Amino acid sequence: MSRSETLFNNAQKHIPGGVNSPVRAFKSVGGTPLFFKHAEGAYVLDEDDKRYVDYVGSWGPMILGHSHPDVLDAVRRQLDHGLSYGAPTALEVEMADLVCSMVPSMEMVRMVSSGTEATMSAIRLARGYTGRDSIIKFEGCYHGHSDSLLVKAGSGALTFGVPNSPGVPAAFAKHTLTLPFNDIEAVRKTLGEVGKEVACIIVEPVAGNMNCVPPAPGFLEGLREACDEHGVVLIFDEVMTGFRVALGGAQAYYGVTPDLSTFGKIIGGGMPVGAFGGKREIMQQISPLGPVYQAGTLSGNPLAMAAGLTTLRLISRPGFHDELTAYTTRMLDGLQQRADAAGIPFVTTQAGGMFGLYFSGADAIVTFEDVMASDVERFKRFFHLMLDGGVYLAPSAFEAGFTSIAHGDKELEITLNAAEKAFAALK
């Protein structure tokens, strides 16, 4: 029995499902989840000392690769001064200044401890600012596990076949209007009917929780126009895309400016961090300036600020995102070529340093229906074949993949060699 199998068996005694986040249980791909003990650069090492090229990157934060020495040094320096103060620090002021300089739409920002906190707080703020109750989200878009957002939520919810979580009161869900992603006409029609009741539209500008679905041409622009017309707050959930698809996030990449944005993952450099912010007139409604309450014991934690600040400064160097995107493109092109050569229906998607893999004969992946029509069973087999070849992909057909600046020619060779064998075995 492997060390991972032993640990997983033991874990299930006191941890529900043996994991602390559902997708880690490998339920959607089968088999025993890997337990990792070390990570460095583009690699993770499991408890049985097998090394894998990592395309999960802790679900997105590790854009520099694992254990970047500058980030570790920054955390060690702060460690000597304490773990948490529950009081303001110079580091959080530096972080706020840096984020607002990188993302032009951010005039003010509030730090929190997770992406879920960020989206939950942004929606509360939008409701308080507008005096309206309803929100619009999109099928297959996941914005954390707060009650009003676990409706057709994609990602882990899709993985486990429970798109609407039990435990969410109907009274909460009734204020959440769910529309098809990339369907701007559905948005216009809905706002035309109930626009005066809608506080905000929240959207992943790249839907990273039904694998990776970029916006259709004109979709984000249409959302901006529709929100302006009906006095609705536009929220971009950039927990995945922020600082990854471009330094200024998806809003810079696609040239569409939201009213509020939420961030997580990269902003913490691997530590638990989230943030939300945007227009000053809206953010001034947050306590202690305004009546909309939000608070957090560990918000702005100094260790997390040290890791996040260092990460953001390192990814600010000229050419960083071009290099990240170029590697991702080379990797996806190589996968597509090998799938085509093997006669396997296969489609890839990309937004900067994030990507999607679909076993599908579709010309493109644009809608939730396109995603659901992909061959999930074939993905399961592919996942395990790649794992055998030393490549760790997200253990779900509905999760995006991530590259890091630490991925290079050697990792590309390992990945494509494993893929060539995997596609051949899938014939």
Curated annotation (Swiss-Prot):
Per its record, how is this protein called by name? Glutamate-1-semialdehyde 2,1-aminomutase
PROSITE patterns documented for this protein: AA_TRANSFER_CLASS_3
Q: Where in the cell is it found?
A: Cytoplasm
Q: Which gene encodes it?
A: hemL
E.C. numbers: 5.4.3.8
A single GO BP term for this record reads: protoporphyrinogen IX biosynthetic process
**In which family does this protein belong, per the annotation?**
Belongs to the class-III pyridoxal-phosphate-dependent aminotransferase family. HemL subfamily.
- Cofactor section: pyridoxal 5'-phosphate
Reactions catalysed, semicolon-separated, are: (S)-4-amino-5-oxopentanoate = 5-aminolevulinate
Classification via Pfam families: Aminotran_3
Span-the-membrane segments of this chain are: none
Lipoprotein is among the record's keywords: no
